[in-house]
Amino acid sequence: MGSAFERVVRRVVQELDHGGEFIPVTSLQSSTGFQPYCLVVRKPSSSWFWKPRYKCVNLSIKDILEPDAAEPDVQRGRSFHFYDAMDGQIQGSVELAAPGQAKIAGGAAVSDSSSTSMNVYSLSVDPNTWQTLLHERHLRQPEHKVLQQLRSRGDNVYVVTEVLQTQKEVEVTRTHKREGSGRFSLPGATCLQGEGQGHLSQKKTVTIPSGSTLAFRVAQLVIDSDLDVLLFPDKKQRTFQPPATGHKRSTSEGAWPQLPSGLSMMRCLHNFLTDGVPAEGAFTEDFQGLRAEVETISKELELLDRELCQLLLEGLEGVLRDQLALRALEEALEQGQSLGPVEPLDGPAGAVLECLVLSSGMLVPELAIPVVYLLGALTMLSETQHKLLAEALESQTLLGPLELVGSLLEQSAPWQERSTMSLPPGLLGNSWGEGAPAWVLLDECGLELGEDTPHVCWEPQAQGRMCALYASLALLSGLSQEPH
């Protein structure tokens, strides 16, 4: 079963935000961090096919302004009662018999049920508050250390302006049951008969605390000589203005060009993907476009010698099993472009990083860009999916899931519409059902799955994770292949 918290968030946002202005919170752990006036950074996406992520920086707007004072009060909107229930059952039976011969009969039933009842309300900052706030206060000097770091990396910074929160503690329960029975008889001199039955029940309960944020809206900060707040963010506007043009810095052979701060690793990746083609027309927004994007990235990996590939794979397998190592590696690569040489890391993250840098500590673009893309895809996936990818990498069974995910992405077009697809037996391998690796990989993406008659119910919200899963499988599989 997929994340119960994410399912609740998805249902609430569908009902209360038809304009698509709210950003869903993706984990219960981070749900308390998104509060009005809190500052967040927008982590650029490594692909056109999944959305950027927002990350709290543990600062409030008051931390970067002076004179020091509490934030103005927020407005509380009216409460909405949300109730969502699902109860479904599929059952069937079969009997095979011939006169005077063996008889075999069996039956099975599968049921799913869940229910959620909660009150949700909004907290928002009055738009007029920003004008008053910026008139009465100004940027703190010297600039806050965290802002200095974000400036050096060229990150865009936003402030949370509105949130949807739970009014009381909510318990979400989802149950999945399977039952089966069978009997047989073998006539003859000695009649042999037998029967059996069994059941399996899974129950997942998640408690969402009172005041948990389910979704939020943001405004963009623009920091120059003073602070401005853009209530309608402009994709072309940067929080920190780049240095004056004409500034040149030296480069070293095989290393990243030392570009002015503000040209982040992710922007270098996008430049690499487009290769002179306008961003809007780089790739079509369908499976063919996704496959073309992944192939563009993987071309660099095909040139690596087997020894380096093996070292990289061993490090990546370790990173997939260690969430802290994954975050440390992502952070190091993000800083590597704008801050110069990267600091060495320990453990599996360090093993991967050693494959991507020169002795000077500078990143090698031909190696770093594909890994940055891969990490961007991996961060879209859950910890459970990471562990399954590590196991598939170890057992060299990546191709089966890759073909299955690719087939589903191709069949489900257009991705913006719900649909139901049958699964060809040839793509399912030896097992399909609750707990099977392929089942769990898809279930964690937010898809509804059918077992007895294998099928998938496509949900538009699953697009980002499914595309990221395909990219992860394709790149890991490509690294694992022997050179042609």
UniProtKB/Swiss-Prot annotation:
Cleavage at Asp-275 by CASP1 (mature and uncleaved precursor forms), CASP4, CASP5 or CASP8 relieves autoinhibition and is sufficient to initiate pyroptosis. Cleavage by CASP1 and CASP4 is not strictly dependent on the consensus cleavage site on GSDMD but depends on an exosite interface on CASP1 that recognizes and binds the Gasdermin-D, C-terminal (GSDMD-CT) part. Cleavage by CASP8 takes place following inactivation of MAP3K7/TAK1 by Yersinia toxin YopJ. Glycosylated: O-GlcNAcylation by OGT leads to reduced cleavage by CASP4 and decreased LPS-induced endothelial cell pyroptosis. Changing residue 15 to K: No spontaneous pyroptosis-inducing activity. GO terms for molecular function: cardiolipin binding; phosphatidic acid binding; phosphatidylinositol-4,5-bisphosphate binding; phosphatidylinositol-4-phosphate binding; phosphatidylserine binding; wide pore channel activity. The modification Phosphotyrosine is found at residues 37, 158. Keywords: Cell membrane, Cytoplasm, Glycoprotein, Immunity, Inflammasome, Inflammatory response, Innate immunity, Lipid-binding, Lipoprotein, Membrane, Mitochondrion, Necrosis, Nucleus, Palmitate, Phosphoprotein, Secreted, Transcription, Transcription regulation, Transmembrane, Transmembrane beta strand, Ubl conjugation. Changing residue 238 to D: Does not affect ability to induce pyroptosis. Changing residue 242 to D: Does not affect ability to induce pyroptosis. Changing residue 283 to A/R: Constitutively active mutant; promotes activation of pyroptosis. A lipid is attached at residue 191 (S-palmitoyl cysteine). Changing residue 193 to A: Abolished cleavage by enterovirus 71 (EV71) Protease 3C and human coronavirus SARS-CoV-2 3C-like proteinase nsp5. GO terms for cellular component: cytosol; extracellular region; extracellular space; ficolin-1-rich granule lumen; membrane; mitochondrial membrane; NLRP3 inflammasome complex; nucleoplasm. The record marks 87-88, 193-194, 275-276, 290-291 as: Cleavage. Glycans are attached at residue 338. The chain crosses the membrane at residues 91-97, 103-108, 180-186, 191-197. Changing residue 373 to D: Spontaneous pyroptosis-inducing activity. The modification S-(2-succinyl)cysteine is found at residues 56, 191, 268, 309, 467. The keyword Transmembrane applies. Changing residue 235 to D: Does not affect ability to induce pyroptosis. Changing residue 192 to D: Decreased induction of pyroptosis and defects in liposome-binding. No spontaneous pyroptosis-inducing activity. Intramolecular interactions between N- and C-terminal domains mediate autoinhibition in the absence of cleavage by inflammatory caspases CASP1, CASP4 or CASP5. The linker helix loop inserts into the N-terminal domain. The intrinsic pyroptosis-inducing activity is carried by Gasdermin-D, N-terminal, that is released upon cleavage by inflammatory caspases. This is Gasdermin-D. It comes from Homo sapiens (Human). The gene is GSDMD.
